[in-house]
């Protein structure tokens, strides 16, 4: 996860010159199962004091929920960039691939209409949904990033999720040891 934060800092500092970053995410960014100050968004804010980081992540959030909240968040905070870390709960609930992709398309369109830089994070789901759904779900993110010509960040949980010492007992959420 430390490498993820270093890359994120580098990207927002040099590529888009972001001074205000909005994180639109779910429990992976909402510090689920730990104190807020132990989660990666808070730790990122501590490392980059010249930024304003707004963590609008909510545990259990879906792409539809994020889309519904986004207009008010954009109006209130007027971010330079928005990191989109959504879709995991859609996948865990078996939502239709087309619906998830349409919601992400709408989220990105809204961000662009508000003159902010969208950054999409790849999301993966556990294999128990079957290889077909899992592959189709994973393919959403590169397709959307390519369609809008935006940055696609790798899923920061890839190496964390395979180490049980870095995960909560639910096997889905990272614990405090996994934070940078």
Language-model features, listed with the residues they occupy:
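N-terminal secretory targeting signals
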Residues: 2-4, 18-19
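Sec-dependent N-terminal signal peptides
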Residues: 3-12
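Short, well-ordered alpha-helical scaffold segments within catalytic/effector domains
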Residues: 3-4, 41, 67, 101
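Single-residue recognition of alpha-helix boundary sites
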Residues: 13, 36-37, 133
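Serine-esterase "nucleophile elbow" of acetyl-processing enzymes
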Residues: 17-63, 67-78
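Alpha-helical cap/lid subdomain in secreted, periplasmic
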Residues: 46-47, 67-180
């Amino acid at each position: 996860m430390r490498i993820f934060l270093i890359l994120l800092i580098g990207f927002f500092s040099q590529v888009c010159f972001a001074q205000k970053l909005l994180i639109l995410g779910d429990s992976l960014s909402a510090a689920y199962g730990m104190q807020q100050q132990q989660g990666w968004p808070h730790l990122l804010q501590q490392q980059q004091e010249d930024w304003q980081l707004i963590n609008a992540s909510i545990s259990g959030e879906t792409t539809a929920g994020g889309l519904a909240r986004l207009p008010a968040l954009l109006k209130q905070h007027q971010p330079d960039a928005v990191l989109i870390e959504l879709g995991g709960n859609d996948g865990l609930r078996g939502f239709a691939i087309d619906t998830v992709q349409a919601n992400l398309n709408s989220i990105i369109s809204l961000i662009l209409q508000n003159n902010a830089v969208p950054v999409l994070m790849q999301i993966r789901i556990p294999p128990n949904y079957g290889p077909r759904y899992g592959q189709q779900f994973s393919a959403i993110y590169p397709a959307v990033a390519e369609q809008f010509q935006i940055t696609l960040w790798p899923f920061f949980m890839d190496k964390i999720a395979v180490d049980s010492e870095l995960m909560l007992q639910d096997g889905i959420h990272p614990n405090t040891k996994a934070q940078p």
